[in-house]
Structure formats: C-alpha cells, structure tokens
Amino acid sequence: MPKRINKAIELLEDDQPIYYTGLHTFSRDYLTYDQGKKDASIWADYINIGMEHGAFDMTGLESYMDGLVDGGPTSSGHITPTVIIELPVQGESAEVIRYNAWQVRQILARGVHGILLCEASSAEAVSAFVESCRYKINDLGVGYGLKDGTRGVG
C-alpha cells in the first residue's frame, strides 16, 4: 500500500532518486484517454508534460488523466503515475504570476500531482506561484513570506 498519492514524494522522503519520462513539447495527439491508459504502466517515477512550449490543452489533459486512472493502478500500487506539468507562464514577477494564476487552477483541477514553474526571476514571483497553488484554508507559512492561498474551495 503506497504511503502517498505521489510516488515521487515517497521516493524523495526515502532519499531515493526519481526518474521521469516525457517531453517539453507534445504533439496535439498525445494527451488522449488511450495514451493515458498506455502510460498507466510506465517505468518512470513521474511523467513530465510540457505546456511551457507545448499546447495548453486542458481537454486533452483531462482525458489523459482519466486514461491513467482507468489503466491503473501502477505496479507500485499508486492510483496513477505521478504527473507534473510545466507551467506555460514565466515567473518574471509576482504580478505576472498572479495575472496567470488561472492556468494553475485549471491544471490542478485536472488531477495532476504537481506543477513546475520553469523560470522565476525573484523570490516574490516564487511566493506568488506557491500562493496560486494553495487553498486559502492552508495557512502554513502565511506571514512568513507567504500570503493566503488564492485557489477557491467551492
């Protein structure tokens, strides 16, 4: 029985390396239900999906995640392999991140395990990114460099 939903975090907690597969761009035909079913038995600890340079395809991502669920569980007992998405927005400033926080909400709503901010130019941009990933009810770190989370809960 897995300790966590996210196998990559499990491995890191055990001081183990993690290995990924995936591309930084995808053809528009990749994010499908059938590909998700196929990838449910993948060898890698996580699957990287590049939306920084690839298409921002939420319909495809949702179908892909459904395929992963239906094709699972993984050989390690996880419901799906870990899926991490490269966020298309650049972290040039906190303002740019906040204006584009809708991308974070859309990606996380599809059931992925994590988001990678590929570039950040300041600590403030990183804080804004973390805030955009968190619900308001999660107050750990608020007042210590973080403001309230901006994701809605209803």
Q: How would you name each of these model-derived features?
A:
Residues 1-154:
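Expand to "…catalyze enediolate/carbanion chemistry for C-C bond making/breaking, isomerization
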